[in-house]
Design a protein with these regions (language model features):
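Cytosolic catalytic domains that perform sulfur/thiol-centered chemistry
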Residues: 1-277
Length: 277
């Protein structure tokens, strides 16, 4: 895998097809409405050699009092799962989904958090792979296990307490990846409280994409992600990773993530909530 070109943000279907025997691929398709749908889709057909990881069961930890809907997984447990699929310190990892990168970006960010930089999201996802005339498979991969030792990047994670302190300081930029109507508090289909954290800027993650569902070119993303030192959030620490990925693809340094995001913020009714713009 040492000779494989490094992909640290995005990889196209053709590029992946050329190096598919030298990479470790993860299918992270998922549906918030039907949590078994992703696994069922994987069983019906997936990219050759792809392993399945579940957002709730593998890419998140247990939900508890005061947490958001998708807390961080135990890094040792996740590292063990990655190693079982063949990931080692030099592996090129690729993640894909069928949600325009919304869930694949979570795995991308988790690997960066674990200290592994050679990870990319398949631009266009499963649909883009098929549109390029590339095949799906049903056979389960039989990898040679790797040796993977997490090297945690604690600087990439912001807690609720730290965020509250930072927001009292001038110069802190908080970016919320949720859709505009949820941000403004006009609707809230998932969480029990509507609105946003006062002072946050709304940059819906879907605007990182073109009409075909692929990421915009880096120069266009650079105009959108001008806040290079921002803290990113969303509803539960998932789609915020999409904005972080887009920011990195634009050439910015890896920003930090408020993992608990909105669903954790509202577990304490002493924390302020805003509505409107």
């Amino acid at each position: 895998m040492v000779n494989t070109p490094e992909y640290r943000t995005l990889i196209g279907p053709g590029e992946l097809a050329e190096c598919i025997d030298q990479v470790v691929i993860f299918d992270v398709r998922f549906s918030l409405a039907d949590t078994q749908a992703g696994r069922q889709l994987y069983q019906a057909g997936h990219l050759p050699k792809a392993h399945f990881l579940d957002l709730d069961g593998d890419l998140s930890g247990p939900v508890g009092p005061g947490t958001g809907r998708h807390p961080l997984p135990d890094p040792v447990e996740l590292g063990t799962k990655l190693a079982a699929a063949g990931v080692n310190s030099e592996a090129q990892v690729v993640a894909y989904d069928d949600s325009h990168g919304a869930f694949a970006a979570r795995l991308w960010w988790l690997l960066r958090w674990l200290g592994h930089d050679r990870v990319a999201v398949l631009n266009g996802g499963c649909a883009g792979w098929q549109a390029a005339g590339l095949p799906l498979a049903t056979a389960l991969p039989q990898p040679e296990p790797g040796q993977f030792q997490p090297q945690l990047r604690h600087d990439l994670v912001v807690s609720s307490e730290a965020l509250a302190d930072l927001l009292e300081q001038s110069g802190t930029t908080l970016i919320d990846a949720r859709g505009a109507q949820r941000f403004r508090g006009e609707e809230e289909p998932i969480d029990p409280v509507a609105g946003h954290i006062p002072g946050a800027i709304n940059l819906p993650f879907a605007a990182n994409l073109d009409d075909s569902g692929k990421f915009l070119p880096a120069e266009q993303l650079r105009q959108r992600h001008e806040h290079r030192q921002a803290i990113h959030m969303c509803g539960s620490g998932v789609t915020a990773c999409h904005n972080i990925l887009a920011s990195c693809h634009a050439g910015n340094e890896l920003p930090s993530l408020y993992v608990g995001s909105w669903s954790e913020w509202i577990t304490d009714d002493r924390r302020p909530v805003a509505t409107g713009e």
